[in-house]
Regions:
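Extended, histidine- and acidic-residue-enriched regions that form the cofactor-binding/catalytic faces
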Residues: 1-87, 91-109, 115-230
Length: 230
């Protein structure tokens, strides 16, 4: 193990670890968000936590506990799915990072396990640079896994509870996956056109509107694809 999980060390050890050369890792993955009838509500949390553990095993970083709640507006209509408004979410994450900035830390990695969270976190990255001189790198899970997923996945479209996500969960937490409940369904994305200041503006609804809360074909998922994607 090259890195350190902050939750596993004592306060004196923490004091030794935290300095101007420290790289802090903050994983963010929804711990209570619908993922269809076949995947657990904590799917994003499990995947992000796994990626954080792998990063910590390989790199000299100090990793914080995975943050389970974030900005997920597409799921406000689904019972049990926790959503934090964008401004509150950005302030919350800023407070977390500033807890280390005040002790000289200037380098951070956010492992972003979401899609809707990416823009708020990119904005926060600029804020942290402008206010504190801190560098915050925000990963893009879809970007990191996209090339591998394109090579191994067969679904015609996807994005949530789909072939890719189901395959990954089968690779890391197979006991939580109910493949007998897997479905193929695709989200409709209605576009509302408006004219503002002489320009056409398109507003695309991102709400999850499929019957089971899946966008893609989860029935095509095996563990082996998940291992390749990871």
């Amino acid at each position: 193990m090259k890195g350190t999980f902050i939750k596993e060390i004592t306060y004196p050890e923490c004091c030794e670890q935290i300095n101007e050369n420290t790289v802090i890792v903050l994983p963010i993955g929804g711990g209570s968000k619908e993922h269809g009838s076949h995947l657990p509500m904590g799917t994003d949390y499990y995947v992000t936590d796994y990626l954080a553990a792998e990063l910590t095993r390989r790199c000299e970083v100090v990793t914080l506990p995975t943050l389970p709640f974030a900005y997920f507006p597409a799921f406000v209509g689904w019972k049990g799915s926790v959503h934090i408004e964008a401004e509150n979410f950005m302030h919350y994450v800023e407070d977390i990072l500033y807890s280390f900035v005040r002790f000289g830390v200037k380098k951070f990695i956010i492992i972003d396990g979401g899609i809707s969270t990416h823009i708020p976190l990119q904005i926060l990255s600029h804020t942290m640079r402008n206010k504190y001189g801190a560098t915050v790198a925000v990963t893009n899970y879809n970007g990191l896994s996209g090339e591998a997923a394109d090579q191994v996945c067969q679904q015609k479209a996807g994005g949530h509870g789909d072939e890719e996500e189901t395959s990954v969960l089968l690779a890391i937490r197979p006991e939580l996956v109910k493949m007998e409940c897997a479905v193929e369904e695709y989200r409709e994305m209605p576009v509302e056109n408006q004219i503002q200041n002489g320009r056409a503006v398109a507003h695309i609804s991102m709400a999850m509107n499929t019957p089971h809360g899946v966008n893609g074909n989860s029935k095509l998922a095996p563990r082996e694809k998940g291992e390749l994607i990871l």
